[in-house]
Amino acid sequence: MSTPTILSILLPTRGRREMLKRSIESLINTASTPGRLEILLGIDEDDEGLTEYLKDEIAPMLLEKQVECRANLFKPLGYENLHQYVNHLAGTATGEWLVFWNDDGIMLTDGWDDEIDKRTGQFKLLAFKDNHNGHPYSIFPILPKDWYNLMDHLSMNAQNDAWLSHIAYMLDIFERIDAEFLHDRADLTGNNDDETFQNRKYQEGNPEDPNDFGHPDMQHARVRSVNKIAWYLKKIGQPSEWWDNVLAGKQDPFEKMKANTSAGVEGAGQFAANDPTGKKSRETKKISDDAKLVL
């Protein structure tokens, strides 16, 4: 009998002890093989009481299901540096797949881990179904560890879902799978309108800011990532004809992302989802035409 594919769960958390327990519980109770899960927590050193809560309330639940969990302690970086948390966690992962997860996420689908495992060996960005009402992104991205091994990072911006989804759409390696979660977030469900939610700082929507998702340097960085991944895809026998056509001027890189965007989309990331190249924002902000997507 073959050894189950390990799935590494990347889970930064702050100030949400009970929510964290509920979120993890939903993952392990719905997994076909919970023992294949490797939960990697990113916790701030000043998150009072969390370490004790993990030992007293969460560890026994994990031991019962034989789920490995490792907590990585950080000096507080803030939401605007969320990518630094997940980049570090990814570097410590031993699984074949990296699965982004949130402490306000609730897994709804039994056997969700099997849906990921079906794609093992494929270099794709996978997406769960969600309650964002037609958002085109992979809100909690799922990707092979080889992505990190190749790039030495997952994202260079706190909007990790946007960063990875844009790259995947440009290469036509985005796939939504038959597994669903509930994002139990204040702007979506009315729940958990807490300090953690209120203190979020988005690096998106102001492309004049060098740290913004839409800044020209950030767009150039994503295109460099696309070119590197396209090279790798050819090496493994999975060439991206889509990207070749983009480079030849025959294909809109974001055609499928636009087609997957509902008019009623809810949640963060709407700026980039509905304006993937930042053109509208450039017109509004009157910044240089250099901010366009450069291929």
Regions found by a protein language model. Name each.
Residues E25-R36:
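Short, acidic, metal-binding catalytic loop of nucleotide-sugar glycosyltransferases
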Residues G35-E48, N72-P76:
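Short beta-strand/loop segment that forms part of the nucleotide-sugar
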Residues L41-D56, G105-I106:
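A conserved acidic beta->alpha catalytic loop
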Residues V86-W97:
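Active-site nucleotide-sugar/metal-binding loop of Leloir-type enzymes
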Residues G95-I106:
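Short beta-strand-to-loop acidic/aromatic patch adjacent to the donor-nucleotide binding site
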Residues D110-F128:
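Conserved donor-nucleotide/metal-binding helix-loop-beta segment in metal-dependent transferases, i.e.
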Residues K124-P141:
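Short beta-strand-to-loop element that shapes/binds the nucleotide-sugar donor at the catalytic cleft/hinge
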Residues A162-F254:
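C-terminal catalytic/acceptor-binding lobe
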